[in-house]
Amino acid sequence: MLDLKYIRANPEKVQEGLSKRNKDVSIAPILELDERRRKLLAEVESLKALQNQKSKEVPKLKKEGKDVTDLMNELKDLSDKIKELDSKVKEVEDEIEKILLTIPNIPHESVPVGKDDTENVEVRRWGEVREPDFEIKPHWEIGVNLGILDFERASKVSGSRFTFYRGLGARLERALINFMLDLHIEKHGYTELFPPFLVARKSMIGTGQLPKFEEDAFKTTDDYFLIPTAEVPVTNYHREEILKEEDLPIKYVAYSACFRAEAGAAGKDTRGLIRQHQFNKVELVKFTKPEDSYDELEKLTADAEDVLKELGLPYRVVLLCSGDLGFSSAKTYDIEVWMPSYGRYVEISSCSNFENYQARRANIRFRRKDGKLDYVHTLNGSGLAVGRTLAAILENFQQKDGTVVVPEVLRKYMGTDVIK
């Protein structure tokens, strides 16, 4: 959530920043409501001062033996009027918060201005793209041929965009999860959390999924939500807390299943593992001091990249332009893995700095050594999306005979060096 005081003090700067997102977002309604709120508050303070003044007259008049009936009636009228105005103030404040929750974050000054993903900027590439001397098969075909992925039975059981992982497919999925967790814990210094997969509405509001994107979420009848990412429970782990400056940055890694309705994804990536209603992901989350957050974003992105380097998968890093930026993010790097059957790079991780946007919504602060309270900056990124990583392994390490070579770092988890 944006800071109302900052909006009030810098309306043109805020509107200019939001306009870079190429979305129709106006802060005019916020400013109008804020002005109304301030006028109401001034009126309340004026009436309270009058009430206080007249209240002091009561004992004085009583001492003089004078009738205070009219004065008491006047005080009652003042009290009723103050209550009425307080109620109006509350209504206006609720409306301000309601609108604030629908306004996205302001892009960081280093984010390139652009309308959509065609104007994202490539930052770097790693690894060599293989050019095999045989016809490349897509991962879903490889998986079915090897008997390790079963889309047909998953469709029978659950509908479209679900998958059964079978035999070495299930083992490969599990190996990837364990490898990613071990790497981030042992090499990168993250603390593991294993979070709930169901969260309350307040948690979804805290990270910015609600109220804007409720149609993309799976909701239960009692107002719980299946998590779209472990970002939600892990960020809310410190909701309504005051952290210690000396404990920052706090770094968590969490495996979870993720659930997405993909309401706006009709016709996109309908085959394979790229766009599923349920998928596994290892998530990285950081809580940092504001002055450190952009350095920490670079480190977090490097940590996610390290997974692909260890696996030997070619990838590139892309800086998202303002028009492609996620709702809550101030700056995002996408990591895209090479997918031979697509003939292009496909997103496998988004690493973002939300600055204090989520922290304000979730009220996560820290106390500086001088005693001052400040909001933390929150960051997160996939480290990585497991199903997409598995798909990339099948495609990049497929052999002419239909087998798939297991990356060396996974062999101790798999107990084999080839899937056949």
UniProtKB/Swiss-Prot annotation:
Disulfide-bond pairs as recorded: none
Catalyzed reactions: tRNA(Ser) + L-serine + ATP = L-seryl-tRNA(Ser) + AMP + diphosphate + H(+); tRNA(Sec) + L-serine + ATP = L-seryl-tRNA(Sec) + AMP + diphosphate + H(+)
EC number: 6.1.1.11
Keyword Zinc tagged: no
Keyword match Protein biosynthesis: yes
GO cellular component: cytoplasm
An individual GO BP term: seryl-tRNA aminoacylation
Alphabetical list of PROSITE patterns matching this protein: AA_TRNA_LIGASE_II (PS50862)
Localization annotation: Cytoplasm
Main location: cytoplasm
CDD domains for this protein: SerRS_core
Stored InterPro entries: aa-tRNA-synt_IIb, aa-tRNA-synth_II, aa-tRNA-synth_II/BPL/LPL, Ser-tRNA-ligase_type_1, Ser-tRNA-synth_1_N, SerRS_1_N_sf, SerRS_core, tRNA-bd_arm
Binding-site positions, L-serine: 229-231, 283, 382
Pathway in which the depicted protein is active: Aminoacyl-tRNA biosynthesis; selenocysteinyl-tRNA(Sec) biosynthesis; L-seryl-tRNA(Sec) from L-serine and tRNA(Sec): step 1/1
Molecular functions per Gene Ontology: ATP binding; catalytic activity, acting on a protein; serine-tRNA ligase activity; transferase activity
Keywords in alphabetical order: Aminoacyl-tRNA synthetase, ATP-binding, Cytoplasm, Ligase, Nucleotide-binding, Protein biosynthesis
Pfam families assigned: Seryl_tRNA_N (PF02403), tRNA-synt_2b (PF00587)
Family of this protein: Belongs to the class-II aminoacyl-tRNA synthetase family. Type-1 seryl-tRNA synthetase subfamily.
HAMAP family: Ser_tRNA_synth_type1
Assembly notes: Homodimer. The tRNA molecule binds across the dimer.
Physiological role: Catalyzes the attachment of serine to tRNA(Ser). Is also able to aminoacylate tRNA(Sec) with serine, to form the misacylated tRNA L-seryl-tRNA(Sec), which will be further converted into selenocysteinyl-tRNA(Sec).
Protein name: Serine--tRNA ligase
Native organism: Caldicellulosiruptor bescii (strain ATCC BAA-1888 / DSM 6725 / KCTC 15123 / Z-1320) (Anaerocellum thermophilum)
